[in-house]
Amino acid sequence: MGRYRVRVVTGAWLFSGSLNLVRLWLVGEHREAKLELQLRPARGKEEEFDFDVPEDLGPLQFVKLHKQHTVVDDAWFCNLITVQGPGTSAEAVFPCYRWVQGEGILSLPEGTARLAGDNALDVFQKYREKELKERQQTYCWATWKEGLPQTIAADCKDDLPPNMRFHEEKRLDFEWTLKAGVLEMGLKRVYTLLRSWNHLEDFDQIFWGQKSALAEKVHQCWQEDELFGYQFLNGANPMLLRRSTSLPSRLVLPSGMEELQAQLEKELKNGSLFEADFILLDGIPANVIRGEPQYLAAPLVMLRMDPGGKLLPMAIQIQPPNPSSPAPTLFLPSDPPLAWLLAKIWVRNSDFQLQELQFHLLNTHLVAEVIAVATMRCLPGLHPIFKLLVPHIRYTMEINTRSRTQLISDGGIFDQVVSTGGGGHVQLLTRAVAQLTYHSLCPPDDLANRGLLRIPSALYARDALQLWEVTARYVKGMVHLFYQSDDIVRGDPELQAWCREITEVGLCHAQDRGFPVSFQSRAQLCHFLTMCVFTCTAQHAAINQGQLDWYGWVPNAPCTMRMPPPTSKDDVTMETVMGSLPDVQKACLQMTITWHLGRLQPDMVPLGHHTEKYFSDPRTKAVLSQFQADLDNLEKEITARNEQLDLPYEYLKPSRIENSITI
C-alpha cells in the first residue's frame, strides 16, 4: 500500500471552474488506480487530496480525467495536476493548461520533455502519435487570400479550437474598450459638428481622451524635419530605412539642382546618405470611400545623418517617374513651408500603409500564426520545442481571426477609412510576400543588410540586437539540454516535419526566400527558434506599440489622403493640406483604432515571465531563470539610457514586450 498526494490546480480567470463532477485515475507502469474522489473544481483554487492505493503502481505515466455532466457541459480549465508518490518528496507534474469538456477521458502524460524515440516505454510514443492525429484534425490550414501565408481554418472566432480562444477577461476587455473608443469617437464628432475644419489647429478639437505623453510631443513637434527623420529610425516603422550605396535610379534631379546632386554625392561618399523607398505602393489601387476617391503615392525620401546622429530629410519625390508623364516634382526643405509639409504628410501616409500591412500584419501577425498552427499540428505536448514555443502563441489565432473578420475584411475598418482598403491592401500584402525573407525576420541579418549597424541614434536597432542576443542564449540553453549533437537534430522526425510544415505549407514554399525545409545542426535550429520567439514577442512590440504614440495625432500619419499628390509647389495652400488629410469621421476612427490596438494590454504577460509550467526538469527552470535575469538587466540598461534622452525609446523594454501576439 502507498499514499499518494494529488494536487489539482484550476485556472484563475472567469468561468475556469466547473460545477460538473471530475474523476481521476493514476496510471503507473505496472497498473492504474481509480481515485475515490468527487471533485468540483473551483476557479483559482489549488486543491490537495491524499489517497491510499493498495498496490504498487510503479513510476507514474499518466493522470486520466473524466468530467461527468448530465444537463450542462460546464467546461473546466485545468492548469496542471501534480502527484507525490509514496516514499518521495518529489512531485510528478502533469501539465494540462486546456479546457476539459465533453464526455471523453483525457489523458495527461507525465510532463518530462521527451523527443520521439526517447521513450523507453512504447506507451508514450503511442500517446504522442494519437495526440498529433487529433490535433491535425482540429488545427487545419486555410487560404485567406491566394498568395498569402496560410491561416487557421476558422471563419470567425467561434470556429476556433477552445484552447486558442481569449479567456473571458481578455474578451471583455477587448470588446468593451472598443465600444468605449467608439463612444468617444461619437462624442468627438458631435463636438465638431458646428465648428470649422479649415486649419491644422482644428485637429485639436478631437485630440483629447485616450492619448499618450509621446503623442502629445508628436502633436507639438510633428512639422519639424528632425522628428520626421527620427521616425524612420525609432518610430512606428523602423523597418524601411536603409543606408544608400548609390543614388537611387528612380531619383530624378531636374536641371538646376546641381548643388543638391553634389550634396547627395558628398553624403553618399561619407556614408551618411540614407533612403526610404515606398515603391511597393506604386500601382496599388486606392480606395473609394462612400463614393469619394482616395489617393496613394509611392514616395522616395533621401535623408542625411548629421554628426550628432540626427536624420534629416534632403529631398522627397512623391511619385516614381513615368515615361508618359512629366518628370515628378522634387520637394525640398527650402520650398514654401506648406508645400514641404504636404510632401512630408504624403510620406507619412505611405509609411502608415506599409507599417500596418507589410511590417505589422504580414511580418509579425501572419508569420506568428503560421508558427502557431504548425506547432499545434506537428509537435506533441511532450516535445521540448513545443514546451518552449507554446507560451509564445497565446491568443494569436483569435486576434488574427478577429482581424480578418473586422479589420481587413470586406467592409471592415480598412475599407472604411484607409487608402489601401477596398482591395488594395490585399494586393499590397501579396507584393510584400516577395520581400518576406528569412533574413528579413532576423535583426542581425536585416540591420546589416540595411546598413543600420552601429548607429548610436538607431535605438530600435540597438535594442533589437540586444534582445535577439538574449533570446538566442535562452534558446540555445534549452535546445542543448535535449539535443546533444547535430545528429539528434537531423534524426528528430517531429522537428523536421514542423520545419517543413512552416516553410512549405504555412509560408507557401518559402524555401526560395531562404527559409529552411530541414534542420541539419543545433546552430541552425537555434537560429530558427530565436527568429520564432523574437517575431512573436519583441518584433511585434516594436511595430505595434508605436501606433498609439505616432498615429494618435492624425496629421503626422494620416490613414488616407483625399486629394491627389501635388505637382506644383506654388499651388499648395492650407485648403489643399486640409482637403488632403482625413475628414473628421476618418480622423476620429483612426484615433480610436490606433489607441485600441496600440495600448498596453491589462492582462499582458511580459516576455519570459509566463507562469505555465510546461517544463518540469530543474535544468530548464535554471535556463528560464537566467533568461529572466538577462531581461531584467537589459531593462535596467534601457531605462538608464532613456533617462538621458529627450525622446525615450520604450517599445523594446522587456517589461513592455508581451510574451505573444495578443492584440
Swiss-Prot record:
How does its activity get regulated? Answer: Activated by EGF. Arachidonic acid conversion is inhibited by (13S,14S)-epoxy-(4Z,7Z,9E,11E,16Z,19Z)-docosahexaenoate (13S,14S-epoxy-DHA). Arachidonate 12-lipoxygenase activity is decreased when PH decreases from 7.4 to 6.
**Which prosthetic group or cofactor does it need?**
Fe cation
List the catalytic activities from the record.
Answer: (5Z,8Z,11Z,14Z)-eicosatetraenoate + O2 = (12S)-hydroperoxy-(5Z,8Z,10E,14Z)-eicosatetraenoate; (9Z,12Z)-octadecadienoate + O2 = (13S)-hydroperoxy-(9Z,11E)-octadecadienoate; 2 leukotriene A4 + O2 + 2 H2O = 2 lipoxin A4; 2 leukotriene A4 + O2 + 2 H2O = 2 lipoxin B4
Domain PLAT, residue spans: 2-114
Specify the pathway.
Lipid metabolism; hydroperoxy eicosatetraenoic acid biosynthesis
Superkingdom is Eukaryota
Q: Which Pfam families match?
A: Lipoxygenase, PLAT
The Lipoxygenase domain covers 115-663
Q: Which GO terms describe its molecular function?
A: arachidonate 12(S)-lipoxygenase activity; arachidonate 15-lipoxygenase activity; hepoxilin-epoxide hydrolase activity; iron ion binding; linoleate 13S-lipoxygenase activity
Under InterPro entries, the record lists: LipOase, LipOase_C, LipOase_C_sf, LipOase_CS, LipOase_Fe_BS, LipOase_mml, PLAT/LH2_dom, PLAT/LH2_dom_sf
Q: Is DNA damage given among the entry's keywords?
A: no
SMART domains in the record: LH2
Known Gene3D superfamilies for this protein? 3.10.450.60, Lipoxygenase-1, Domain 5, PLAT/LH2 domain
Could you say which residues bind Fe cation here?
360, 365, 540, 544, 663
**Gene Ontology CC:** cytoplasm; cytosol; membrane; sarcolemma
Q: Which UniProt keywords apply?
A: Cytoplasm, Dioxygenase, Fatty acid metabolism, Hydrolase, Iron, Lipid metabolism, Membrane, Metal-binding, Oxidoreductase, Phosphoprotein
Outcome after substituting residue 663 to S/N: Little activity (8-15%)
The Phosphoserine modification is found at 246
Q: What tissue specificity is annotated for this entry?
A: Found primarily in platelets and in microsomal and cytosolic fractions of the epidermis (at protein level).
Quote the protein name from its UniProt record: Polyunsaturated fatty acid lipoxygenase ALOX12
Q: Which organism is it from?
A: Mus musculus
